[in-house]
Curated annotation (Swiss-Prot):
Protein name: Acetyl-coenzyme A carboxylase carboxyl transferase subunit beta
Keywords associated with the record: ATP-binding, Cytoplasm, Fatty acid biosynthesis, Fatty acid metabolism, Lipid biosynthesis, Lipid metabolism, Nucleotide-binding, Transferase
Compartments (UniProt record): Cytoplasm
Pathway: Lipid metabolism; malonyl-CoA biosynthesis; malonyl-CoA from acetyl-CoA: step 1/1
Disulfide bonds: none
Catalytic activity: N(6)-carboxybiotinyl-L-lysyl-[protein] + acetyl-CoA = N(6)-biotinyl-L-lysyl-[protein] + malonyl-CoA
Keyword Methyltransferase recorded: no
Membership in a protein family: Belongs to the AccD/PCCB family.
NCBIfam families tied to this protein: accD
InterPro entries xref list: AcCoA_carboxyl_beta, Acetyl_CoA_COase_Trfase_b_su, ClpP/crotonase-like_dom_sf, COA_CT_N
Entry keyword annotation includes Cytoplasm: yes
Subunit details: Acetyl-CoA carboxylase is a heterohexamer composed of biotin carboxyl carrier protein (AccB), biotin carboxylase (AccC) and two subunits each of ACCase subunit alpha (AccA) and ACCase subunit beta (AccD).
Enzyme class: transferase
């Protein structure tokens, strides 16, 4: 009996433990409950095949999906004070930052990169909701400003993929100051007459919506994205009225003139490429599989 207890049972437990399915192998659709294999979801740009629901996409995957051949050069971002207010609520802010950096592998919520999009140089910034809800703090603000300045210096369009819960409360007024700073940087880009295109992803709210996320020359959103200042539940509790169906969703805002277009993620790259070439007055690329028309002799 001791032999069975001491040798056989541990071996059986070890064998079964090795065969356990990892927790992230299957992803559940928030709308329909459909289970999707994680590799199939990644191959489909994190769009649920049956429902079309757009899952969140991290910054690096977004950059790779947008630039030609997934190739880009990341822009070095300015360093900022880590925790100037020495903020603490239930936990120290510095500890929350460390956890977010360990979880995502990023220094903060915004990444900026340069590269080619449909053979045209562009500068792109991506806000990652996975890093403390994509909140806007000093580091994120500096990143957006640096991206806008890089676009102005290089003479490229600037594309902003926004995703945020708003200003980072742990940084107080220093966080709120990023709203006018980014707005001023947008104006500087406009003076160079280079386009600023915003892609609103789910969700984009709070101080980000009240600043750079709604100041694009062209405003695009992904299907079903929640876009607004305060959330719908907060508004309903304040005005004590039921909001219309789909209120603050991308389609509702498009119908009411707040957006220029709602674009499926599968068409996003081509749409952005066409817009950039049009606004930069670059010649249109020939359709895929078709050779350019030969010049007359």
């Amino acid at each position: 009996m001791n032999w069975i207890s001491n040798v056989v049972r541990p071996k059986i437990r070890d064998f079964l433990a090795r065969r356990e399915v990892p927790e992230n192998l299957w992803v559940k659709c928030p709308e329909t409950g459909q289970m999707v294999f994680h590799k199939d979801l990644e191959a489909n740009l994190y769009v649920i095949p049956a429902s079309g629901y757009h899952m969140r996409m991290d910054a690096v995957k977004r950059l790779k999906a947008t630039f030609d051949d997934g190739a880009y050069e990341e822009v070095a971002l300015p360093e900022v004070a880590t925790d100037p207010l020495k903020f603490r609520d239930e936990r120290r802010y510095i500890d929350r930052l460390k956890d977010a950096r360990t979880k995502t592998g990023y220094q903060d919520a915004v990444k900026v990169a340069t590269g080619m999009l449909t053979e045209l140089p562009v500068t792109i910034a991506v806000q990652d909701f996975g890093f403390m809800g994509g909140s806007l703090g000093m580091a994120a603000g500096e990143a957006v400003v640096k991206g806008l300045q890089t676009a102005a210096e290089k003479g490229t369009p600037f594309i902003m993929f926004a995703a945020s819960g708003g200003a980072r409360m742990q940084e107080g007024i220093l966080s709120l100051m990023q709203m006018p700073r980014t707005t001023a940087a947008i104006q500087e880009l406009r003076e160079t007459r280079k386009p600023y295109i915003v892609v609103l992803t789910n969700p984009t709210t709070g101080g980000v919506t009240a600043s750079y996320a709604m100041l694009g020359d062209i405003q695009i959103a992904e299907p079903g994205a929640l876009i607004g200042f305060a959330g719908p539940r907060v508004i309903e509790q304040t005005i004590r009225e039921k909001l219309p169906d789909g209120f603050q969703r991308a389609e509702y805002l498009h119908e009411h003139g707040m957006l220029d277009m709602v674009v499926h993620r599968h068409q996003m790259r081509d749409t952005l490429g066409r817009l950039c070439r049009m606004l930069m007055k670059a010649p249109a690329l020939p359709p895929k599989g078709r050779l350019p028309r030969p010049e007359a002799a």
